[in-house]
Each structure stands twice: as C-alpha cells, then as structure tokens.
Amino acid sequence: MLSLNEIKFPSHWNLVPNEPSYVDYVYREGLDLGVWRPDNQRDRMAHNNVVSLTRFFWPNVDFERLVMGGELMLWFFTFDDGLDAGIYDDQKSVDLVRRMEIVFMDGPEKVAFRLRSRCLEMCGKRRDTFNRFISSCVQWVDSIIPFNKVKDGGSPHIELYSFLRKINIGAYPCVTLTEVMLNHHLEPYIWSDPRWLKMNENIAIVVTLINDLVSYEKEVNDNAGVLNPLYFFQHQNNQNLPDSYRKMVNLIHQYVNDYLHLEEGFLRSMAPFHDALQHQEVHFMLDHLHYLITGSRMWSMQTPRYCSPTSPFIEMRPPSKSYL
C-alpha cells in the first residue's frame, strides 16, 4: 500500500479549508448559464466535486473572492472535460478552442462574462493585472489540444511531459486570479521577475505530479495511462508501481527544494519592504503558491472524483465511504 504522506512539504504550507457556502452560489450561476441541468443529482455532485477545490486553493479569502475562484473552476470543468473526453473531432475541437479564446479576450458569452466582469471591476486601473489573467486563461486553452495529441506518439520523456503539462494543468490562471484579488500595493515589475516566473513553473509541475498520482487509477481504467508518469515510468524503466512512486516522490521533493531556494532569493531581492501592506501582499501570493500544492493533495484525499476503494493510496480509500 502506498501513502501520499510520503510526500513532505514545509509545515507552514499547511492549511484549513475555507467555508463552503460559495459552492451553492456558484451552482445557481451554473444552472443559470446552462452548465448544469436542474434537479440532476449527478450534475450536482460533479459541481460540488470540482468547485470545492476553490476552498483549498484560497483558504483565507472572503466570499466574493471565493466565488471568483469557483467560477474559474466551473469554467475549467465546462471546457476541459469535453475536450478530454474525446467527444469532438479535430476540427470541432479547434473551433471550440478558438471560440473560448474570443470569449476570454472579448467576453461575448455568459460562460466567462461574469468572471471576466468581476475581475475587470476588481482590477480597476490595473489593466496589466487584468491582461495577465486573461492571457494565462488563453494560454491554458491553447495548451489542451497539443497536450492531448502527445499520446499519439506514445508516452513522452518526463522533461517534455513537464514542459507541456506545467501550462496544461491550469495553475497559472489560479495565480494570476490571485493577483487580481490583491488590493494593489505591489509594483507590476515583480511579476516579470525571473525568480517569480520560475517559482510558478516549479509549483505548476508539482501540482501536475500530485494530480497524476491521485488520478492514476482513474486514468489507467480509462485507458489514459500513457500520459501519467506513475504509469509510464513503470513501462519506460521496467519498474514496479512502488519503485515508480518513489521516483515521483523524489522528483516532487527536488522541485520543492528548488522552489524554496528560488523563494528565498525572491524575498531577498525585495527587501526591505516599503510597508506592512506590501509585505502582506507578497506573502499572500506566496501562500497561494504553497496552497496550490498542499490544497491539491488535501482535496484529492476526499473527493469522489478520484477516491476509490481500490486506490493504490491508503489515504484515498477510506472504508467508511462509498464512491460513484
């Protein structure tokens, strides 16, 4: 039996999830948008599973900001699951991607209009912040088809996989949305600091690897293991499951250690802070990067999306629950 607790993170990255009342609010928005069918239990469960992730990524924000995070997760689900399911042919998939690019750049459709409008209002004169958020969403949209096509050539090398997946996992829009949530006591040049950009990459890759671990059984059962490192390490390296897991744990720890070194240099480069508000907002952003990792693991241990009585991870198959 494998344990996700073999993956170690700094103790100050631990979190207590935010309150869940926003989930119902975003669900009613989803009904209004036509994302969900009224009185459909399966739709309601799917919504709760996906949107509940927000309270782990943003454990310390207010209701308005939780709603924004929930709307982002709802949009991710609406767009990504359809393409991943393979229900569209190539041309239809390309057309859908182009349509979603326009939705986020110009905001003509309700599916993204509310979130886009909230962000624009919260940013005020910070159009650079708003543009970074929209650009990260468009970048994520553009990554989905290329990543899905990688499997046509078989399992990739882990370096190629990580390079593509760090965009495809969707961490960057979460980070830029968190920048939108700030009250703006920071200079915009911070976000082009090479340390900050590399920190984002490392966090995105760790989130990816955690997601690959918790989704392993589901993806193998869906014949999608070719793009899961826990699966393809076994075949590329002729290893068993425990050895492949240890390889992934070591890889995660390597990225975390590199991140910690970068974060230390990033903070040194900003010292001294101009005031307490600047210090607070920098650490708000850093905490969000931490929570993307620890929140992903914590959420995955309790969501029916991945939990299973036959999961290889002991934390994901509690005997007292039944799963769909």
Curated annotation (Swiss-Prot):
Highest taxon of the lineage: Eukaryota
GO molecular function, one term: metal ion binding
Reaction it catalyzes: (2E,6E)-farnesyl diphosphate = (2S,3R,6S,9S)-(-)-protoillud-7-ene + diphosphate
Alphabetical list of InterPro entries matching this protein: Isoprenoid_synthase_dom_sf, Terpene_cyclase-like_2
Residues spanned by motif NDxxSxxxD/E motif: 211-219
DDxx(x)D/E motif (motif): residue ranges: 80-85
GO biological process terms, semicolon-separated: terpene biosynthetic process
Keywords: Lyase, Metal-binding
Pfam families on file: Terpene_syn_C_2
Coiled-coil segments: none
E.C. number(s) listed in UniProt: 4.2.3.160
UniProt similarity note: Belongs to the terpene synthase family.
PANTHER family the record matches: TERPENE SYNTHASE, TERPENE SYNTHASE 2-RELATED
Domain note: Contains several highly conserved motifs that are important for catalytic activity including the aspartate-rich 'DDxx(x)D/E' motif and the 'NDxxSxxxD/E' motif, both of which are involved in complexing metal ions to coordinate the binding of the isoprenyl diphosphate substrate in the active site.
Function: Terpene synthase that converts its substrate farnesyl diphosphate (FPP) into the sesquiterpene protoillud-7-ene.
Name recorded for this polypeptide: Terpene synthase 18
Organism field: Heterostelium pallidum
